[in-house]
Amino acid sequence: MKIAGKWKRKAAKAPLHRGTVARHPCLIVRLPVEEQGEIEWQVRSSNGESLLSQGRGSIEQVRPALAAYPSVTFTRVLVPATDVTFYALTLPRQARRHVTQVVPFMLEDQLATEIEKLHFAVLEIHGDDGTVAVVEKNRMQRWLAQCDALGLSVDTLLPDARVLPKHQDGWSALQHDDMWLFRQPTGHAMAAESSWCGDLLKASMPLPAIYSYSAASVGGELAQYEWQEEGEWKAQPETDLFTLAATAHLPASVDLRQGDYAPDKAWQNTLLPWRGVGIAFACYLLLVVADAGWAHYQLYQQAEHWRQESVRVYRQIFPSETNVVNPRAQMQQHLQRTAAGGAGKALLDQLTPLQQLMTQNSAIKIQSLSYDGAAGEFRLALQGTSYQELEQFQQQAAAYYQVQAGEMRQENDRVEGRLTLRSQQ
């Protein structure tokens, strides 16, 4: 394996100036057509224009060489365009939400392989026109396995011919080793060995202009084929595949890793070690919210209980009223009307303790209630579950009234009794 080491020696001789911001290089890796073929790689400057180091070899040879560059700006992995087939499709906007499910069935009639064995990636969409790359799943799995074996953190995995510049009026062409790569304006890409390249071009005639980024031209190895015009082959500044791959501005959609092969997002990888802590914290929050909700529910139940108790007492005092919405406001209305008759204050002073007693002894029901304003006394017919309840009520009432106990009797499972409560004043 050949590795250029000039950059390392220059870096050792040329110290960094103060204030210089160190920029990480970028890494380009090209996987071979054959599984046991040589893997090519280059480390280039952050802008991709300068070669810093390069090499080729097997996974066992390349991995330790790449380990010397743990921090890179980006890593782009090129796969052979010969293993990828491109199709043009019309993709209505309403179908794009489910594009991964729709595309395989749109292409099913054009494919010789079962769609279950193929991977589909939409590389670009312009209006309603889309370019779809189709590759066998076992090849995708092999490429990803090779990347893992090399210890790569891949940013983009794409067909090698897709890094060629795009020309609206013609094809782009580049020779790499013994392979010619072509990119069409539609986004389709082709590749052919040099020995077959002429046949490929002849079969595609009439040809548009071909913008070549390699030194080879019509006058060279392709001279044996008939051309319409000499000007069809337009020489461009000579460059190489790795330079184009490092300097190309690639959209995110050009990545073949879509659908089942889509990479995990960086933030997901960052949060993965904290997943257990996050789950525990979420459970804690759930318990806190549940406890707060239960406490709120209990308070609501208590408030509802006392509201119902107020309604019950009010209806016992005023049995003729059936519509009780706000017992407190309705009681105040009664007191205001009574006060207009001159006995309001005395009634209020005696009624307040009675309301408290009925609230404290919720098991006791008022069967009837009358008030004698002249005597200043309440006459109550009460009903409870036992003699003890009525006696307890009588003892508590003695703190506020002069109590005169009447007859008590057992009626089925209830105890009834009468009390006269007179003001202590």
Curated annotation (Swiss-Prot):
Where is the protein localized? Cell inner membrane
Q: Name one Pfam family in it.
A: T2SSL
- The superkingdom listed in its UniProt entry is Bacteria
Question: What is the protein's membrane topology class?
Answer: Single-pass membrane protein
Describe the subunit structure: Type II secretion system is composed of four main components: the outer membrane complex, the inner membrane complex, the cytoplasmic secretion ATPase and the periplasm-spanning pseudopilus. Forms homodimers. Interacts with OutM/GspM. Interacts with OutE/GspE and OutF/GspF.
Q: What's an example Gene Ontology biological process for this entry? A: protein secretion by the type II secretion system
Gene coding for it:
outL
Q: Which keywords does this Swiss-Prot/TrEMBL entry list? A: Cell inner membrane, Cell membrane, Membrane, Protein transport, Transmembrane, Transmembrane helix, Transport
Q: Which GO terms describe its cellular component?
A: Gram-negative-bacterium-type cell wall; plasma membrane; type II protein secretion system complex
Record's family? Belongs to the GSP L family.
Segments passing through the bilayer: 274-290
User: What NCBIfam families does this protein's entry cite?
Assistant: typeII_sec_gspL
Q: Which residues lie on this side of the membrane: Periplasmic?
A: 291-425
Q: Which stretches are Cytoplasmic in the membrane topology?
A: 1-273
Main location (coarse class): membrane
Q: What is this protein called?
A: Type II secretion system protein L
* Species this protein is from: Pectobacterium carotovorum subsp. carotovorum (Erwinia carotovora subsp. carotovora)
